[in-house]
Regions:
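Basic, glycine/lysine-rich polyanion-binding surfaces/domains
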Residues: 1-196
Length: 196
């Protein structure tokens, strides 16, 4: 049974499955999953008109009703990641109402999975993720290797699983830095398979 912070698959819509067996630490590029961002005083109300339930608290996330996730970044900003809903919201927000502002999301999106994730985080980030209660579905805005990131910790296949978003202009640097550390920890890259 899936707990509130446990992903059934990477995309949580049974479309994406891990191909390789996870070793102690793996990295995967999830930038191909469509994203949509919106902010503003009436963003929450506008999302409600689109039948999107939002997390109750700032800096938290929840699953969407049909898969995917929505993160509440602060009070009035939201990040939606889903293969179906995100493109629909992009279209619906081409002419947004007053006090609703679309946010272009061109992030590099990666995930870290494996029992050595915390070891990597200790080397790259000053935030203590071990102190979190992931059952509360936290969204953490911090820096990793000097790059501002948004992080959602969770569990996938009974292992720590961290989704990480960063500005794409810093993506190559962050990937290079993380891959070097992952290599030192005897980890590697993992493949994903999209099921049609």
């Amino acid at each position: 049974m899936r707990t509130s912070n446990s992903f059934s698959t990477i995309g949580d819509v049974n479309e994406i499955q891990i191909v390789d067996n996870v070793t102690q630490l793996e990295i995967v590029d999830l930038s191909f999953i469509p994203r949509f961002g919106v902010k503003g005083e009436l963003a929450e109300a506008w999302l409600a008109t689109q039948s999107i339930a939002v997390p109750d608290f700032p800096n938290s996330w929840c699953f969407l009703s049909k898969g995917g996730i929505i993160a509440r970044l602060g009070t009035n900003e939201f990040l939606i990641e889903d293969r179906t809903i995100a493109p629909q919201l992009i279209t619906a927000c081409k002419s947004p109402p007053a006090k609703v502002y679309p946010v272009l999301r061109q992030d590099l999106v990666i995930a870290l999975i494996g029992f050595q994730v915390n070891e990597l985080l200790l080397q790259t980030c000053s935030f203590n993720f071990q102190a979190l209660s992931i059952t509360e579905n936290p969204v953490i805005l911090t820096s990793m290797a000097g790059v501002n990131v948004t992080v959602i910790p969770g569990v996938l296949q009974e292992q720590p699983f961290y989704r990480i978003w960063c500005d794409c202009t810093f993506g190559a640097y962050l990937l290079q830095t993380l891959n070097a550390i992952i290599s030192e920890l005897n980890g590697g890259a993992i493949a994903v398979k999209t099921l049609l």
